[in-house]
UniProtKB/Swiss-Prot annotation:
Source organism of this protein record: Mus musculus (Mouse)
Protein name per UniProt: Pseudokinase FAM20A
Cleaved signal peptide residues: 1-33
Major subcellular site: secreted
Tissue specificity field: In the mammary gland, expressed at higher levels in lactating mice than in virgin mice. Observed throughout the tissues of the mandibular incisor, including the secretory and maturation stage ameloblasts, the suprabasal layers of the gingival epithelium and the odontoblasts. Weak expression in the enamel matrix.
Keywords: Biomineralization, Disulfide bond, Endoplasmic reticulum, Glycoprotein, Golgi apparatus, Secreted, Signal
Subunit structure: Interacts with FAM20C; probably forming a heterotetramer of 2 subunits of FAM20A and 2 subunits of FAM20C.
Annotated Gene Ontology cellular component terms: cytoplasm; endoplasmic reticulum; extracellular space; Golgi apparatus
Record's keyword annotation contains NAD: no
Gene induction: By all-trans retinoic acid (atRA) and IL3 in EML cell line.
Xref: InterPro entries: FAM20, FAM20_C
Lineage: Eukaryota, Metazoa, Chordata, Craniata, Vertebrata
Phenotype seen when the gene is deleted: Mice survive to adulthood and show biomineralization defects such as severe amelogenesis imperfecta (AI). In addition, mice develop disseminated calcifications of muscular arteries and intrapulmonary calcifications, similar to those of fetuin-A (Ahsg) deficient mice, although they are normocalcemic and normophosphatemic, with normal dentin and bone.
GO MF: protein serine/threonine kinase activator activity
Length: 541
């Protein structure tokens, strides 16, 4: 019996020693870290160090599935990193809550003529498209003896791309309060692809050139149409240039690379300017093997895939755009960055007009256009239909402001929906040649503004607001781009260039006002009802 009691005592002592060691080496250090905030892990949301940009990006990507980022809605509150109490709301949140972004647009949306699509007609059209897809897919599988357990596609009217199309109206491609846009961005980022193909333009041009006559054989036009599992589709532009690279000085604008990150950033800037004329665009890491090669039915596209010496999967475009494998794009080994821009409604449903830009550049190695030589060129334009009897010229100037901010010299045409007539807005498509050189401000892009000395009051008020410290353009762009999966989308020099170029625009307007007077320069256009006093800016400052 004494021996048994001794064994029990030894066991209790051993357990006590183990518990003490665990308390000292594991529990006590955690208690100490909780008591000393400066020593908390870096990932803690209330620690002395802010989470990294990549964590912000990942969180934004996760939250898109459940949160609707309507532009006037509240963004998540951000805890102060050291004091532990709520910090002031973000600049992006404050911007979209400003009265300029709340005022009702004029004229109000009243009837069917204000919406691009007739909903019932559009839904019938899309149902037929899905049924035709299912028939063709079945024939394709039978032709090649393919077995697939995938059920036929079902058309869903609530799909985000359908709601985006039905929401296009006479004010813009989407409303400020649209809930479908956040869902569409999320779906394009995450939905699996079911097909990949060349665009219709590229199909029409395949083989219709002599590769030896190409000025610079490069992948500037390498792009694909991807269709997703919800039957939505987007234009995919792969990464051709690293973010840190600038366009060389001796490159002509018409042979510059098309940059995927420029397409993404252009959508965010367009939204911040409250134009809403750029189709929703996101970045995505695409598996070129699983999401392009294995789902395409185009034999030409299949034939241009190869494995590089570094064991990366690559593909290139056929003539006329480039003719050699050294101009291919490659995954790493399968994953490739790219931009995805949502398609607009079919031309069968919503015809568009493509119009040459009056300030088009000379697409030759020498020579200049009239506007580059004649400072009074705008007087001539004002005498020509439709610039003599509509707000079209103000739309051209809006587009010039947008292009100057992103540094896009390649706006040779613009498109409009024919339904909205001469006063309809210009759609800002194909922005991939923007953000090429942050160190140079191409003043010639502002020629429509400088020569015509006109600008919409609404546009000017937004520009002046974005020049204020509380709503600084570079800051709200930086914050907005954190939502994207490929963040950081722009390098810091490109963001700072936006502020510099904004000041140049405002100085140009100021010079116009000094020369011609405010009444001749500031145009009401088809902007909006009068904003509250808090939203008015000093037009001469």
């Amino acid at each position: 019996m004494p021996g048994l009691r001794r064994d029990r005592l030894l066991a209790l002592l051993l357990l006590g020693a183990l518990f003490s060691a665990d308390l000292y080496f594991h529990l006590w250090p955690q208690v100490q870290r909780q008591l000393r905030p400066g020593e908390r892990p870096a990932a803690c949301p209330c620690s002395g160090r802010a989470p990294s940009a990549s964590l912000h990006s990942a969180a934004a990507s996760r939250d898109l599935g459940t949160a609707s980022h309507n532009f006037s809605g509240a963004l998540p509150r951000v805890e102060h990193p050291s004091r532990g109490h709520p910090a002031p709301r973000s600049k992006l949140q404050a911007l979209f809550a400003h009265s300029l972004y709340q005022v009702l647009e004029d004229p109000p949306l009243l009837g069917p003529e204000d919406w691009l699509l007739a909903s019932q007609e559009a839904l019938r059209y899309y149902r037929r498209k899905v049924a035709r897809w299912n028939r063709r897919h079945k024939i394709y599988k039978e032709q090649f003896n393919l077995t697939s357990l995938d059920p036929p596609l079902q058309f869903r009217p609530e799909a985000s791309w359908v709601q985006f199309h039905l929401g296009i109206n006479s004010h813009g491609l989407y409303s400020r309060s649209s809930l479908a846009i956040s869902k569409l961005l999320h779906d394009m980022r995450h939905f699996p692809t079911i097909s990949a193909d060349y665009s219709q333009d590229e199909k029409a041009l395949l083989g219709a050139c002599d590769c030896s006559q190409i000025v610079k054989p490069s992948g500037v036009h390498l792009k694909l149409v991807l269709r997703f599992s919800d039957f939505g589709k987007a234009m995919f532009k792969p990464m051709r240039q690293q973010r840190e690279e600038e366009t060389p000085e001796d490159f002509f604008y018409f042979i510059d690379f098309q940059r995927h990150n420029a397409e993404i950033a252009a959508f965010h800037l367009d939204r911040i300017l409250d134009f809403r004329r750029v189709p929703p665009t996101v970045g995505r890491l695409v598996n070129v093997t699983k999401e392009i090669l294995e789902v395409t039915k185009n034999e030409i596209l299949q034939s241009v895939f190869f494995v590089s010496p570094a064991n990366n999967v690559c593909f290139f475009a056929k003539c006329p755009y480039m003719c050699k494998t050294e101009y291919a794009v490659c995954g790493n080994p399968h994953l490739l960055e790219g931009s995805l821009s949502a398609f607009l409604p079919s031309l069968n449903l919503a015809p568009r007009l493509s119009v040459p830009n009056p300030w088009i550049r000379s697409y030759s190695l020498s020579g200049k256009e009239e506007w580059e030589l004649n400072p009074l060129y705008c007087d001539t334009v004002k005498q020509i239909y439709p610039y003599n009897s509509s707000n079209r010229l103000l739309g051209i100037i809006d587009m010039a402001v947008f292009d100057f901010l992103i540094g896009n010299m390649d706006r040779h045409h613009y498109e409009m929906f024919t339904k909205f007539g001469d006063d309809g807005y210009l759609i800002h498509l194909d922005n991939a040649r923007g953000f090429g050189r942050h160190s140079q401000d191409e003043i010639s892009i502002l020629a429509p503004l400088a020569q015509c000395c006109m600008i919409k009051r609404k546009t000017l008020l937004h520009l002046q607001l974005l020049a204020q410290a509380d709503y600084r353009l570079s800051d709200v762009m930086r914050e907005s781009l954190l939502e994207d999966q490929l963040s950081p989308v722009l390098t810091e020099p490109h963001l700072l260039a936006l502020d510099r170029r904004l000041q140049i625009i405002l100085k140009t307007v100021e010079d116009c006002i000094e020369a011609h007077g405010e009444r001749r320069v500031i145009a009401e256009g088809s902007a909006q009802r009068s904003a509250p006093d808090s939203g008015q800016a000093n037009l001469t400052s």
